Amino acid sequence: MLDIVKFAESGQLFDNHYKLLRSLNTDGGTADVWLALDANTVKDRSRLDDAPHLSDDEVQELGLVVAIKIYRPKNALDIEGEQRFRDEYMIVFNCNHTNLLHPTNYSIFDEVPYLVLPYCRQGSSEKLIGKLKKDADIWKYIEDVASGLAYLHACTPPIIHQDIKPGNILIDDIFNYAITDFGISSKKGGKHGYYFDDENSGTLAYMAPERFLESTEPIPQSDIWAFGATLYELLTGNVPFGEDGGYAQAQQSVAMPDVPGVSADIQRLIHACLALNPEDRPTAEQLALSARQKQFPIKSRKPLYISLVVIALLLVGGLSFFLGGNNCWVSRLTSNICRVPIATATRP
């Protein structure tokens, strides 16, 4: 069974490709995340042994620095599980969006699956917990994360993240927010049990009420609830319903918590995301649109041509009155304009 710490200390290349430098300790109970150097990009390979003792800047001068997420040996896969892992991550691998931090490579070493991801030196949004205060910064966060979720949910079939939380939102070098760990749905076939099963996917404090029901298929609305819980924690320093998340909300009929110090629009948005009924929650696309317009809900706006038709009717009506209403062409024009279909503006 692979002991990743001892393996790193041995100085060997992971999968004959990556020099493990140090643990990033950014994951939960299913995997270890390591900073690594892609040995194939290092010109002077004699310096590989020195790499673990160098600063990030010095290592980046040697070659490509990446983050490797190595799933723990208890999640080792049999042959069927390996194929499912490859099939599922081929879908995720092909996702391309600014606000998604997708893997650049994935494989299996010593029966243990691993992912290769871009290294984000700025870390995750966990460091913003209780510190995200300015409305402009909050709207930026909402737009970036909601845009990434909207992309995933629009895939065929939809990709449900199932573990949206501050630690899974990373900050890139130009301070955009990017979702990581997406695409983790139910994958059975583990050699020592199940790998990524529904029971273990997700973090309780961010799990929507419906996630605790038996035989519930993953739905996009559960990601929206988790996003609402994430926003609440970033703004207040606490998760909205305690460590039991949506379970506590459903069992205790807890009142919706206030979000102090933010605009009414942002508070309404968070409350809508945390609605007990999944059907009452906004879509990710609606959240992204709200962030761009900095309001929630989006106010209805009648199309411009409606106003133009009204103006035309008034002008023609005035002209008809001026001419005494006896001109046939005026009557026909008025009649034709009145038959122009006027669409009713709806909320997106």
Language-model features: locations:
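AlphaC helix of the eukaryotic protein kinase fold
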Residues: N75-N94
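Activation-segment/catalytic-loop signature of the eukaryotic protein kinase fold
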Residues: Y106
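Conserved short submotifs of the Hanks-type protein kinase catalytic core
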Residues: D110-S124, L128
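Catalytic-loop of the protein kinase fold
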Residues: H153-I171
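Conserved activation segment of eukaryotic-like protein kinases, specifically the C-terminal portion
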Residues: Y195-E210
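Conserved end of the kinase activation segment
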Residues: R211-Q221
